Regions:
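Glycine-rich Rossmann-fold phosphate-binding loop(s) that bind the pyrophosphate
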Residues: 136, 143-144
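NAD(P)-dependent dehydrogenase/reductase Rossmann-like domain
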Residues: 250, 263, 271-387
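N-terminal Rossmann-fold NAD(P) dinucleotide-binding loop
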Residues: 147-148
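Oxidoreductase and adenylate-handling cofactor-binding alpha/beta cores
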Residues: 87-106, 152-159, 285-298, 334-338
Length: 387
């Protein structure tokens, strides 16, 4: 029997995938799995029993990923599960930035008691006029799950779409429309495009990547959209660019005191994945990842350990080992198993940066003594009997 705990409400459609071998717990005590959306986990004390954390969403800033890796806790996210919801909001943001739809709606609300509001509307509508997005140039920084969907949708609406992503995956490239043009540098993006939308993860290398230098290279009157992470944009430089007219509109999904209330900024309260469909898709993917890991030892979409798949566990003794990616580890593992008279039927070892993961199918179950010996190896963080 496995136990899981939800730190946030998780869509029931996902939880329904758990079978009778899983029990929902009210606390973290004795849980093997944790499901989370936005709850802050950096100051949480996790029990030794926790083997996996699944984030029902893409960003993992609220999870101490490195600390989890040190403890052998595999952290999953659900890339692409909320992509369509974010894509649709990006498109809405482009339209709202192109015409003063919000201002027009607010005007109607203010003047709703005027008897001749219909005639007033005809006189006042010019102040809310704007431009169409058809034929405009859109630059997309980052062509992952969301960026590629935005690219295809914008192209279908008649925009001239350019994409920049030096790390684009094969799958994402295959899914792009042939009409999407490739930009080889950020300088090309900044200098040519009418609209720029950012879809990259928040890393040390991307923090405040949209800065004063970047704004200086952009076309006058550019529209900037950020539905990825708030810290990708240097907001002090942004305010200067808005006040000078370099940036016409900034549309973001991240509210704070700097951007809220500025007339050149449209802010939504983190609505990107706030759709029923996105929440369900994220929950379903997260639960499937948890089950495959706990029942088979397989890893897919982990942010701190490598992908690893040995299929459905049918062996008498499959063990999963998280450890440092250091020399001589495999020989130490196999030496202990051999000394215990345990024959290896199948085995795989994968690494990701500082950390590695080993799955071993044995022809017979490992003894408690053998498992303790594996755990005692320097660099091994967790040894788990899958079956």
């Amino acid at each position: 029997m496995f136990q899981y705990h939800c730190l946030n409400p998780i869509a029931q459609k996902g939880l329904d995938i758990f079978d009778d071998n899983y029990k929902k717990a009210d606390t973290l005590d004795d849980c093997q799995a944790v499901l989370v959306r936005s709850a802050k986990m950096h100051d949480m004390e996790l029990p030794e029993s926790v083997a996996v954390i699944a984030r029902a969403g893409a960003g993992v800033n609220n999870i101490p990923v490195k600390e989890c890796a040190e403890k052998g806790i595999v952290v999953f996210n659900t890339p692409g599960a909320n992509a369509n919801g974010v894509k649709e909001l990006v498109l809405a943001g482009m339209l709202l930035a192109s015409r003063d739809i919000v201002g027009g709606i607010e005007w109607v609300q203010r003047e709703k008691d005027q008897e001749d509001i219909d005639k007033l509307a005809e006189k006042q509508k010019k102040q809310f006029a704007g431009c169409e997005i058809m034929g405009k140039k859109l630059g997309i920084i980052g062509l992952g799950a969301i960026g590629s969907m935005v690219a295809n949708a914008a192209a279908s609406l008649g925009m001239e779409v350019y994409g920049y992503d030096p790390y684009i995956s094969i799958d994402a490239a295959w899914n792009l429309s042939r009409t999407i043009k490739h930009s080889k540098s950020l300088d090309e993006i900044y200098s040519k495009w009418d609209y720029i939308t950012v879809h990259v993860p928040l890393l040390d290398s991307t923090k405040k990547m949209i800065n004063k230098e970047a704004f200086e290279k952009m076309k006058d009157g550019v529209v900037l959209l950020n539905f990825a992470r708030d810290l990708l944009v240097d907001e002090d430089a942004l305010i200067e660019a808005l006040n000078s007219g370099k940036v016409k509109k900034y549309v973001t999904d991240f509210a704070n005191h700097t951007v809220a209330g500025h007339e050149g900024i449209l802010v939504t309260p983190h609505l990107g994945a706030s759709t029923e469909e996105s929440e369900e898709n994220c929950a379903v993917m997260a639960v499937k990842e948890v089950r495959d890991f706990l029942e088979n030892g397989n890893i897919k979409n982990s942010v701190n350990f490598p992908n690893c798949d040995m299929g459905t566990c049918v062996a008498v003794g499959r063990i999963a080992i998280t450890h440092k990616n250091i020399p001589n580890m495999i020989s130490q593992l196999t030496k202990i198993l051999g000394a215990e008279g345990l024959n290896i039927a199948d085995m795989t070892n994968k690494s990701k940066g500082e950390y590695a993961y080993t799955l071993i199918d044995l022809e017979s179950a490992a003894s408690a003594e053998a498992l303790d010996a594996l755990k005692a190896i320097e660099g091994v963080s967790k040894v788990r009997v899958v079956k």
